[in-house]
Design a protein with these regions (language model features):
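Extreme N-terminal starter segment of soluble prokaryotic enzymes
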Residues: 1-4
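Functional cores that coordinate and move charged inorganic groups
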Residues: 114, 144-181
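Glycine-rich nucleotide/cofactor/substrate-binding loop typically near the N-terminus or early
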Residues: 23-111, 165-181
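Alpha-helical transmembrane cores and adjacent cytosolic helix/loop segments
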Residues: 102-122, 126
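General beta-strand structural signal in soluble alpha/beta enzymes
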Residues: 6, 92, 112, 118-122, ...
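Acidic, glycine-rich active-site loops and adjacent beta-strand->loop/helix elements
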Residues: 9-10, 37-39, 124-126, 151-159
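Conserved phosphate/anionic-ligand binding catalytic regions in large, soluble enzymes, centered on
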Residues: 6-20, 120-143
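Flexible, glycine/proline-enriched loop segments at strand-loop-helix junctions
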Residues: 85-94, 119-126, 157-164
Length: 181
């Protein structure tokens, strides 16, 4: 069993995960091939290696070069179709779909509906697809079958999203973290 530990002292994001995977040996060419396999028009990766406060880092940005009237809205079935059409390893496809399914279940619970009726806003956008599928593919390439992370620094306040202003952590995030120490 190969375990990866994420030290999330300042939080975590898809771009941060992709950078960390590159730092521990995921070949850039493999990540770019995964992004290409998704067949998302106008999506590119910008990878840089800055020195931040004296420490080497890997910075990944997903650029979407077409207009997405705010965000693409996709249902779980559309994401499943997109993953099915992509030239991905079947295990990566299944794990990525499991991630999106878990997200749909959390969103459905807080919105009082079913997972198949959830339309993803931010998570259905092209950059989020790259973040999630790229992370799943990177973990698979590295042979990681167990992921552990430090406690997440949860904050308070409000954030604007497709449903208006919601409290932080967002209700679906709270649902995902239920029972996590």
């Amino acid at each position: 069993m190969r375990t990866a530990y994420l030290d999330c002292f300042s939080g975590v994001s898809g771009d941060m995960l992709l950078g960390a995977l590159l730092d521990v040996g995921l070949p850039e060419a493999h990540l770019r091939a995964v992004v290409s396999a998704l067949q998302l028009d106008g999506v590119t990766l910008e990878i840089s290696r800055p020195v931040v406060q004296g420490f080497a880092a890997t910075h990944v940005q997903v650029h979407v070069h077409h207009h997405e009237h705010d965000h693409v809205h996709r249902h779980l079935a559309e994401i499943a179709d997109l993953l099915e059409r992509a030239d991905l390893d079947p295990a990566v496809r299944a794990r990525a779909l499991a991630v999106f399914t878990r997200l749909a279940e959390a969103e459905a619970a807080v919105h009082g509906t079913t997972p198949d009726r959830i339309h993803f806003h931010e998570v259905g956008a092209d950059d989020a697809l790259v973040d999630i599928v790229g992370t799943v593919a990177g973990l698979a390439w590295l042979g990681v079958d167990r992921l552990v992370c430090s406690p997440l620094p949860l904050t308070g306040g409000w954030v604007a999203c497709a449903h208006g202003e919601v409290p932080l952590p967002a209700p679906a995030v709270c649902r995902l973290l239920a029972g996590v120490p």
